[in-house]
Amino acid sequence: MKPLDNLCHPVSVIKDAEMLAAEAFGAKHAFFIVNGTTAAVQTMIFTSCKAGDKIIMPRNVHRSAINALVVCGAIPVYVNPGTNKQLGIPLGMSVKDVEKAIKENPDAKA
């Protein structure tokens, strides 16, 4: 049924939605993943890194990213996320810390 489309090979409404998402995010392409976040995270790492490549990531990264590093052999460059002192929860990486990691690791692939 063409109107319902197929996530594995979009040709109509899903393809249109992916194109709209890419436009909204200022990207060349956007792809909706079929197998959930773990597959999406691992796909991002597998497509951007190979054995020995450095990848900059937060120290509290999801275990799916760690598993991808083990499988592909990429080397993590960890950036410690900030912490919300009032709530005691981790925040994202600061722009300053990411810029520092990039300057210290200009050979990082991602």
Regions found by a protein language model. Give the residues of each.
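Conserved N-terminal alpha-helix of the aminotransferase class I/II PLP-enzyme fold
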Residues: M1-A39
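Well-ordered alpha-helical segments embedded in enzymatic catalytic cores
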Residues: D16-L20, A39-M44, M93-K100
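Conserved beta-loop-alpha segment that forms the PLP phosphate-binding cup at the N-terminus of a helix
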Residues: K28-I55, A65-A68
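General small-molecule cofactor/ligand-binding pocket signal
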Residues: F31, V77-V79
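A glycine- and small-aliphatic-rich helix-loop capping segment at beta-alpha/alpha-beta transitions
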Residues: T47-A51, G73-V77, E99
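Substrate-binding/gating loop at the entrance of the active-site cleft, primarily
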Residues: M57-P76
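Short, acidic/turn-prone active-site loops that include or flank metal/cofactor-
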Residues: N60-H62, N80-Q86
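Active-site phosphate-binding strand-loop segment of PLP-dependent enzymes
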Residues: Q86-A110
